[in-house]
């Protein structure tokens, strides 16, 4: 089928408005333009953005001679409770805000101009635990074809074996006829289809797809006057006593959880922003992404294929127990099978997708009904695609606590909270909501630290409340359960364990455990890159920026990324590179010297707020806390030619030093056990002059694409001055400014 992009020609307005809509280009996040107020019902979840319902309009022109053709609209993502109307008739309803879905236009079209309306609802707040965005935030396209055509998503490709490399290609057609298939480097082949044609091809000297060598092949299928083009990778996935293997070789999944937003762009799924995010994560040392907690975009899959990034595509954040008042729970039972079907159809041909996850921190897995549902969903996914394992991210400690009544969400609580919020809003006052569910536990962990959650997971009751659900998935997904790994691998000799959500400071420990135990298949840190909403959960901010640490209106992001909201790698990213053996370091990072000893906002998801800078103007004479990250026997730290200290590195790749701050040259040197130098890292203090330096990430950019430009206060040589402050005004000639901001949560 032929795809026509429908990114332009749209207007958007609040549903019910009588004024003409504003002209917009898709993908479009309508929520990003809304005010942030203390009365926002989404509150800390959404970064204080208000929620509204939206109406999008455009026309579709259908020539008289094409009216009998097949016309199918594809919406890649509409948040949420989407309605599609054609010529005044309701053509479709799809409640889940993160799924792609299709609309058969045939019953509603006429020749000439047709009115297309799409409604996206987001006034029903709160409906998400993080910033969702709203509207048509992913692309829309129209698929068309004549009577004889290849069905939409009608080409399926899988690798059968590697020696020799054999791929199976299934083609589904709307009618009988001859199917012609071309794969680069192979002769053209033809088969007759009775609705399906199956090709088995041998590829000599195949170029395999791996994270290190993401080789892709192009497959072109022709049937009658129709054509479909797919890319695929030759690769196999296996799981068992040898752990997780790709092409027969064990691969340790070293991943990062990410939300779907793109920072300053909001929820807009821009291919350039997505490509940048994948690149930054890979440079940090990750080889995998967990799409938390919803199916990822097609743009992300294409980039992960191209760049060599493994993907765990996750379905949802809840099943039948609410986490927010107006979430997907009322629709879940009716729609989960269709949602999973669409997720698998989207993912099937992508070599990057190696895992499916049915959910995140679903405490339903502690209940008899939820245990049965775990098996039902796993089996359903196996029926759709048996080539990939199925997991579910289970917070072991939360399962136990929720089973004895702590922090449980209920409809009764929701009703009371909604009534309080409505009364407060009517009076023009903000209301502080009682934390329940995941937020209750996250707040508790923030106050008590990561050890609270990890130690809690070792309780016997945690095993009791998870073991039956774990038996109903291919790989057991442990959220914050690292202290259980050794015990459970011994107790359950058939179990494979995935750290489906973990703390940054456990990266080294995980890597060393995984190297010794194949059934520990991988790890996904929370989180790889900062994201909008769920404010303050992963941030260390001081009182000059965040009075009272209350997560109030000034906050917009979580602050929990190893990479900040603007895409800048932090000290934690440098630690991660070393812990995951991207390289051996050394790297130096320095905690903010202007705040040495000061209290900061609490978070278990922050390992350090150190940054690679030795330019702390006005802090002369104050104590500086310095961190060195290296895989080495020992490290030395030097300041202005004199040694500050030596530290042996045992069971970690992290050394701390303390010194009185003075400008100059700070240098770390790493050594092996024989005393041979392995590497060195230097930080130099910036000079007196201060200027704004604009640094584009690309040397050139094509029309219609993004160019990220970092603005920094620096000296004349380009050394950043982290304490310099000021107001910046930006004007763009020859382009459009689509986002401007800093990384302060």
Sequence positions of predicted segments:
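Active-site-adjacent substrate/metal-binding segments within catalytic domains
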Residues: 35-62, 66-75, 79-86, 92-95, ...
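Core domains of carbohydrate- and sulfate-ester-processing enzymes
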Residues: 4-53, 105, 118-153, 242, ...
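Accessory beta-strand-rich segments of carbohydrate-active enzymes
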Residues: 3-16, 30, 46, 51-151, ...
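Short flexible loop/turn segments that cap and initiate beta-strands
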Residues: 179, 212-216, 623-625, 631-633, ...
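Aromatic/hydrophobic beta-strand junction motif of beta-rich domains
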Residues: 75, 167-175, 248, 624-630, ...
């Amino acid at each position: 089928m032929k795809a026509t992009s429908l990114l332009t020609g749209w207007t958007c307005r609040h549903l019910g408005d009588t004024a003409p809509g504003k002209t917009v280009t898709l993908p479009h996040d309508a929520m990003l333009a809304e005010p942030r107020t203390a009365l926002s019902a989404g509150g800390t979840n959404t970064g204080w953005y208000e929620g509204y319902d939206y109406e999008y309009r455009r026309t579709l022109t259908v020539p008289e001679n094409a009216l009998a053709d097949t016309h199918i609209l594809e919406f890649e993502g509409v948040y949420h409770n989407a309605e599609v109307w054609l010529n005044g008739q309701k053509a479709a309803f799809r409640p889940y805000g993160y799924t792609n879905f299709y609309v058969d236009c045939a019953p509603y079209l006429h020749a000439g101009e047709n009115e297309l309306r799409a409604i996206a609802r987001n006034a029903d707040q709160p409906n998400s635990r993080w910033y969702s965005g709203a509207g048509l935030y992913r692309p829309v396209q129209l698929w068309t074809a004549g009577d004889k055509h290849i069905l939409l998503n009608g080409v399926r490709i899988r690798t059968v074996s590697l020696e020799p490399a054999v791929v199976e290609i299934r083609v589904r057609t709307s009618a009988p006829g001859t199917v012609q298939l071309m794969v680069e480097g192979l002769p053209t082949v033809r088969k007759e289809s009775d609705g399906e044609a199956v090709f088995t091809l041998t590829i000599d000297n195949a170029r395999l797809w791996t994270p290190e060598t993401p080789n892709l092949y192009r497959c072109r299928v022709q049937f009658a006057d129709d054509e479909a083009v797919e890319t695929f990778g030759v690769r196999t996935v296996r799981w068992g006593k040898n752990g997780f293997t790709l092409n027969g070789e064990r691969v340790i999944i070293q991943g990062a959880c990410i939300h779907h937003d793109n920072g300053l762009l909001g929820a807009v799924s821009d291919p350039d922003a997505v490509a940048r995010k994948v690149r930054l994560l890979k440079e940090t040392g990750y080889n995998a992404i967990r799409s938390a907690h919803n199916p990822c975009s097609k743009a992300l899959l294409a980039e992960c294929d191209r760049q060599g990034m493994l993907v765990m595509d996750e379905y949802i954040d809840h099943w039948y127990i609410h986490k927010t008042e107006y979430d997907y729970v009322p629709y879940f039972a009716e729609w989960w099978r269709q949602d999973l079907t669409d997720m698998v159809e989207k993912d099937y041909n992508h070599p990057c997708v190696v895992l499916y996850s049915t959910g995140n921190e679903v405490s339903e897995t502690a209940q008899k009904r939820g245990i049965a549902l775990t098996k039902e969903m796993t089996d359903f996914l196996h029926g759709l695609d048996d080539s990939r394992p199925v997991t579910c991210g289970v917070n072991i400690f939360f399962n136990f606590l929720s089973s004895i009544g702590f922090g449980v969400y209920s409809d009764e609580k929701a009703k009371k909270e909604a009534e309080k919020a409505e009364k407060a809003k009517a009076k023009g006052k903000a209301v502080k909501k009682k934390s329940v569910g995941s937020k209750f536990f996250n707040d508790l962990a923030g106050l008590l630290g990561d050890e609270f959650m990890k130690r809690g997971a070792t309780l016997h009751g945690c095993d009791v409340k998870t073991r039956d659900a774990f038996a109903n998935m291919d790989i057991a997904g442990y959220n914050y359960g690292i202290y259980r790994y050794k015990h459970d691998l011994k107790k359950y000799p058939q179990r494979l364990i995935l750290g489906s959500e973990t703390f940054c400071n456990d990266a080294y420990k995980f890597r060393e455990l995984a190297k010794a135990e194949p059934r520990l298949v991988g790890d996904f840190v929370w989180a790889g890159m900062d994201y909008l909403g769920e404010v303050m959960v992963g941030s260390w901010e001081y009182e000059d920026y965040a009075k009272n640490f209350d997560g109030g209106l000034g906050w917009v992001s979580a602050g929990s990324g190893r990479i900040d909201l603007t895409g800048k790698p932090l000290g934690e990213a440098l630690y991660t590179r070393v812990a995951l053996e991207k390289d051996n370091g050394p790297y130096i990072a320095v905690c903010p010297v202007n705040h040495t000893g000061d209290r900061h906002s609490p978070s278990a998801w922050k390992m350090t707020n150190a940054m690679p800078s030795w330019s702390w103007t006005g802090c002369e004479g104050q104590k500086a806390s310095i961190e060195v990250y290296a895989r080495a026997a020992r490290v030395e730290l030097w300041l202005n030619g004199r040694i500050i200290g030596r530290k042996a590195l045992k069971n970690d790749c992290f050394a701390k030093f303390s010194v009185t701050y003075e400008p100059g040259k700070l240098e770390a040197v790493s050594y092996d056990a024989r005393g041979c130098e392995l590497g060195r890292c230097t930080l130099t203090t910036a000079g007196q002059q201060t200027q704004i330096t604009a640094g584009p990430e690309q040397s050139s950019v094509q029309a219609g694409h993004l160019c990220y430009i970092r603005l920094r206060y620096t000296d004349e040589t380009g050394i950043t001055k982290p304490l310099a402050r000021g107001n910046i005004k930006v004007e763009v000639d020859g382009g459009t400014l689509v986002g401007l901001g800093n990384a302060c949560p």
